[in-house]
Amino acid sequence: GHAECRIFIVEGEEQLDKALEVRARLPSLERIIVMDPEGLRTFRDPQVLTWEEFLNLGRVHRAEHPAAVEARLGRIAPDDVAVLIYTSGTTGPPKGVMLTHRNILWTLESLHAVVGFRHDDEILSYLPLSHIAERLLSVFVPARFGGVVNFVENVDTVMENLREVAPTILFGVPRIWEKLYSAVSLHMREVDPVKRTAYRLTVAVGRRAAPHRWKGRPLPIGLRLLYGLCDLAVLRPLRRRLGLHRVRSVLSGAAPIAPDILGYFWSIGVPIREIYGQTEGSGPTSVHREGDVRLGTVGVPLPGVEVRLAQDGEILVRGGNVFTGYFKDPAATAAALRDGWLYSGDVGVFDEDGHLRITDRKKDIFITAAGKNIAPQYIENKLKFSPYINDAVVIGDRRRYLVALIVIDEENVTEWAQDRRLPFTTYTDLSQHEEVRGLIAREVEAVNKTVSSPEQVKKFAILPKRLYAEDGEVTPTLKVKRKAIMEKYADLIEPLYASA
């Protein structure tokens, strides 16, 4: 309703039922188009068309008005709105971001200068197309540069489809890389000692080689020979098993990722470059360049993009990628766009070489009762490096110490529990098992040893369920909706402070 859409395209009967339920509240709606009409053979509604009927309307119209399409194309100006993309809603209600044709084409050319898209690229599409990253890589990039887009069967088959497709370009949200790392780590714990030792030695060699590759430097002769042997014997088969043996350009974005995860993939020959941006910037703002990678940063601004920091550290962006405003929301537009600069809502710093490091979302940084500034994502990323922790939400605003809500990794914890013959029947049963709590406690303690005293998690609770976008707990790209979770699970949080 907010977007004033005239046409509603749905997949099949289930989605059609949902559309029919709300159409009375959509005064702009003229047609509902059904892609798969199975089960609707006898259904009749003057507002509903099948995809084929919709195409036939176009054929008839073009026959009667052969110049109509070209005439409409001729009236489109570069600064006309091309697409409305709604924000993920992590810090408030979703807002409709207006991106122009100029925004999109300018961003494509700037990103192409860094990534180098090719007409024969293979792309794996697994995020909702409502997300700017997926729209950019799975729709706009192929339309401009060519390539083949492969859509996953469903969210549960992403890893399997990754192996089948073996893409040449892959954009991965942190959860993808975390799951791949966890899968390899746990598999290697189960293999025989000889294979496990060979793997560990190989990764150690890869870690020695990685800093040279970050800088685009040739490896010293001895290391080059050793790494070549390791790559041939272990790493190349491992990349093939993961579906990463053909990948040419690998990007991680949409949320912060732990440098340890990035370092691991570089060590096995998968050169992930971190990319940073937001919907209001048509997607990318900065990215690592080949031969100039700094783990823990998001690289340098794209060609033509300016980035500076406000006095409070907020990241400001200016360039051809910056949007024109929020649809029907002048107040939010005025807050986000000031003097030609986009106020990102993120806080960051530049290192001595101009690489941008993201501290956290401005709204997420909190101050403890002792007056210490805490960036929770830094701690959460360390916790999620554990193969047994799928998600973590760190809490401590105006509190005496930090606590965390933990979501276990179901697959890995299940395997761990079965190896120890622990009795359980459901996910909830597993998550609340005393020995599982002990496992997570050890993982939390390991992280606490790597951070300062104010950043240590003193207590935690394990959530009895997974986090779902449908429940308003995470975004479609699996970013945690912090405020919603803190409100929903207040009854678990407060007891963690009750005995303090």
Regions found by a protein language model. Name each.
Residues 322, 337, 355-384, 413-434, ...:
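Adenylate-forming
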